[in-house]
Amino acid sequence: MDFSLSEERKMLQETVARFFESNYQNINKRNENVNLPEGFCKNFWKESAELGIISALVSPKFGGLGGDGDDISIIFELIGKSLCVEPFLASGVLSSTILSSVSNPNLDLINQIVEGKLLIAFAHTEMNNRYEDSFIENSASLKDNKWCLNGTKSFVINGDTANKVIVSARIDGDVNDKAGIGLFLVDNDQIKNRSYNTVDGYRASELIFDTAKAELIARDNEALSCIIKANSAGALALSAEALGIMETCFNLTLDYLKTRNQFGKSIGSFQSIQHRMVDMMLEIEQVKSAVMLASSTYRSDEKTRDRNISAAKNLVGRVGKLVAEETIQLHGDRKSVV
């Protein structure tokens, strides 16, 4: 199987890499963006839209230029390398995936996302929810022929800066029923928002709905299918982002080992350290292969797609921890080498 990128995707990769490198030169620039009122740089987001980076996350059927697994993984691997904090995940992947998967897609909203004019967040996680996509306690009911939502959503990425939020809520049935689920579009002014910074610099929110007016965009099997697809797309994006972070950590550590001297020679010349670096490189290569497989089967049937994305996510969790521990330790004690 040929996993080499097409000429178009090579151009996308090179363009995005140059753009991120010029705007995220170092960690100080990232910290500046994190500390802005929105938690990210609006100008950078606008320029991303103008360059077609957001568009590359959306299918041509809905006004985009890409939207395949390879497009997602290319962009998010580079996001990981630059530690970019703009809302590519919340608006560019999660929300656009749902809006383009419903039976009556709102092309105007999707186009506004692609153009960088509209931010939409996806609110699905709840306090009592673990890993079941269908477990939903938030409720939706009709009042004067209009849908109203009640309940609380947790850990909503970019929920405080979004113009609108896509919300999952239960129309009927028990909290873990696969039927009776609805997806709703809610304006930000209908929501009580408690925002906070996450440990990695992103902005998340707890959203409270108290008879919030909402527009139904999908229900029952269609709604659940959209939720599953969005979560799969998000898992692929985050797996690729983690791969980019691992590669950067490895390269920074390799440079350090070449320049750090101890006992009259660079510590990278010690065989025990070389073995640790080789082991780490092999693990990262396995992650890269898993992400490539998940990307290549993103448009396959749901079972194949979710199996490969889950496998990549599982491997990322294990190897990511290993790489973090190893790179920190190899940057460690300046007094002696064991």
Regions found by a protein language model. Give the residues of each.
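N-terminal glycine-rich flavin-associated loop
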Residues: 84-105
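Conserved protein kinase catalytic domain
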Residues: 73-76, 96-99, 166, 185, ...
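Short beta-strand-to-turn element immediately C-terminal to the catalytic PLP-Schiff-base lysine
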Residues: 99-103, 141, 167-170, 185-187, ...
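Flexible, small-/acidic-enriched active-site or ligand-binding loops
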Residues: 135-137, 155-156, 186-219
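A short, Trp-centered hydrophobic/proline-enriched beta-strand micro-motif
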Residues: 116-127, 167
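A short core secondary-structure module
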Residues: 152-190
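Active-site-adjacent elements of ketosynthase-type condensing enzymes
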Residues: 128-139
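Alpha-helical interface subdomain recognition
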Residues: 1-83, 102-105, 112, 116-117, ...
